[in-house]
């Protein structure tokens, strides 16, 4: 996958000249600012490569060419505003969308690796009255099914030490869902995300903003290394995540990530699920304990008379 700066350089050096040429325009008739290219990359494409970026650039060139042919202008300097005018409503909404989707307990963004590069994978957990029922949906494969069951078993086995409500799993059914149901998903690297989503749901603690994670887990709560670290980190950066939780044994895989990306993000290396939960979830809210109004002992009045109601006894 390419970084955002690499995509801008490729667009200026190759994609824009080619689309201008293929659409019968002169180089001075349509120009793109870096800001406009950034808008296309962030709001209209979400990919590791540049194919979608070139298609959007081509669409803008065609619309600009049509306006030039109709006499509505001689030259177009493409800005972010013109991008939105030519391409209409943005497809993706960046960090704001992520924060909105994770504003409730039980929803956690994970990092996935696909044939198209890295991507964000949301894990959603909900509960229903019942008892011990568990289902996972979202077009997932056998390995991910097993990861989900391992995550549930770990959380149930640690319920007391995690401070989860007593008897919760005996009284509720659990449903895990991974959206984009038409896209097949598989692999073990969503284990930490599933475990975190379950604890978040049961405890009511939301995931911290701008945070993503990846890692396989064991029944004993160990976090194992995974693949596709570079692609996952690039996807996190593309989507506005500022913090990424990684297995400690993947630490050296960051050598493949460009320095500009590493400097702009925070990485937390974990060995256990407890490490993940401490880093990912908001601190539990302390319940306001009712203050006991202990009665102060009343001093026995001294001998003597006093007409002052504010004092007992003498001066």
Model-identified regions with their sequence ranges:
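Glycine/threonine-rich ATP-lid/beta-loop region of ATP-binding domains
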Residues: 47-111
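Peripheral, non-AAA+ core regions of ATP-driven protein-machinery
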Residues: 96, 104-109, 117-315
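A glycine-rich phosphate-binding loop feature that marks nucleotide/adenosyl-phosphate handling sites
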Residues: 33-37, 60, 77-83, 170-179, ...
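Conserved C-terminal "switch" segment of AAA+ ATPases
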Residues: 1-58, 63-76, 158-167, 205-208
């Amino acid at each position: 996958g390419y970084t955002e700066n690499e995509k801008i350089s490729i667009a200026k050096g190759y994609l824009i000249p080619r689309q201008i040429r293929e659409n019968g325009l002169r180089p001075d008739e349509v120009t793109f600012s870096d800001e406009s290219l950034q808008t296309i990359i962030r709001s209209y494409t979400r990919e590791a490569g540049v194919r979608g970026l070139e298609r959007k650039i081509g669409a803008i060139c065609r619309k600009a060419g049509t306006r030039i042919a109709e006499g509505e202008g001689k030259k177009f300097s493409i800005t972010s505003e013109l991008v939105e005018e030519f391409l209409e409503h943005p497809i993706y909404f960046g960090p704001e969308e992520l924060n909105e989707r994770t504003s409730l307990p039980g929803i956690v963004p994970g990092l996935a690796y696909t044939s198209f590069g890295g991507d964000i994978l949301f894990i959603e957990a909900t509960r229903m009255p019942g008892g011990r029922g568990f289902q996972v949906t979202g077009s997932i494969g056998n390995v991910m099914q097993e990861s989900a069951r391992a995550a549930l078993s770990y959380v149930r086995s640690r319920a007391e030490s995690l401070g989860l409500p007593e008897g919760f799993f005996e009284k509720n059914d659990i449903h895990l869902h991974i959206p984009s149901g038409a896209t097949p998903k598989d692999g073990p690297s969503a284990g930490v995300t599933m475990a975190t989503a379950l604890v978040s749901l049961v405890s009511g603690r939301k995931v911290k903003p701008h945070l993503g994670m990846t890692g396989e887990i064991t029944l004993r709560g160990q976090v194992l290394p995974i693949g596709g670290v570079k692609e996952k980190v690039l996807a996190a950066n593309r989507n506005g995540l500022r913090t990424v939780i990684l297995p400690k044994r993947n630490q050296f895989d960051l050598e493949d990530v460009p320095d500009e990306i590493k400097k702009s993000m925070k990485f937390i290396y974990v060995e256990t699920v407890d490490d993940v939960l401490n880093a990912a979830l908001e601190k539990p809210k302390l319940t306001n304990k009712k203050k006991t109004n202990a009665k102060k002992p009343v001093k026995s009045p001294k001998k003597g008379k006093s007409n002052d109601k504010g004092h007992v006894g003498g001066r």
